[in-house]
């Protein structure tokens, strides 16, 4: 009798724990963040293709798309382009691009985007005309409010000297942010020295014209927009009672997937103090942005890893990054077929690598684990909505 009673108590405890786990999963906010990096966007594109493929298998649904699973998708520069591709609706109100179409997009258009050199020593390296053309053709007249999930795409206004973040949740108070997606995409990709800044106008709540003079989002958020994406997710939660559990920035209630475009561990070893002691403005100008981006990306990852671990929720944060790029794969604008093939290989090889020295789990295993959480959460919400 005592054994039976103990067994029943154990069953009740298991059911209670399971129920609590699923309730917690149902309440979680899911965030996808994609770094900038020009043609190196092929690397996160390869990772996204793997993740979406796993979700399709788990849910037995070939039409499953990443926008169905993430509450917030954010990106800067090429990450902003990827964000638009997987959240902008087509005529059937589904994402106009599946994840497995991202890499082919780069192969088709990359050589043209990074081939229209202006030939001006004092001007941008590329004229940006083909980039704008392909964005208009693919994104059409779609605006921010039509995105299939919340987005967070950053840019920087060089006239007001302020960052500009395009999100759906800010449109009620700032309708001027409801810009066309192709204007936003070009702006977040308009890296100084590579592409010209972008000027366009929208309308304010009073119907007045509002001007934008924008450059690359990395100027505003550096190359890693993960913190930006989290802040948007937190503000989104403040407005939605379903996400009440994360209003105090409880990372236990957040799933964050952050995708990098690769760095090189050798970069910091390239120069010595003795060598750079005699450098002037021109020499520093050629490398300082890369140094700043690499350092800031590292610090963002370090901060997020620390705060997630402090709340005993380190499994809720996954940073997918290749830290050992070499040769032409380090370049933002080498769109030669050979280099793009190498970038695909980098992404595929990355899946087999361990997440860190302290975590033997491979990126492939970690992404499968993330996919399972995303799939289960979607099913739980669908079941709740059906009642």
Swiss-Prot record:
The keyword Glycoprotein applies. A motif (GXSXG) lies at residues 75-79. Residues 32-230 form the PNPLA domain. Residues 361-385 form a coiled coil. Keywords: Coiled coil, Glycoprotein, Hydrolase, Lipid degradation, Lipid metabolism, Plant defense, Signal, Storage protein, Vacuole. It comes from the Eukaryota. One of its GO terms (cellular component) is vacuole. It is found in: Vacuole. One of its GO terms (biological process) is defense response. Residues 1-23 form the signal peptide. Probable lipolytic acyl hydrolase (LAH), an activity which is thought to be involved in the response of tubers to pathogens. The nitrogen atoms of the two glycine residues in the GGXR motif define the oxyanion hole, and stabilize the oxyanion that forms during the nucleophilic attack by the catalytic serine during substrate cleavage. Patatin have a dual role as a somatic storage protein and as an enzyme involved in host resistance. This is Patatin group D-2.
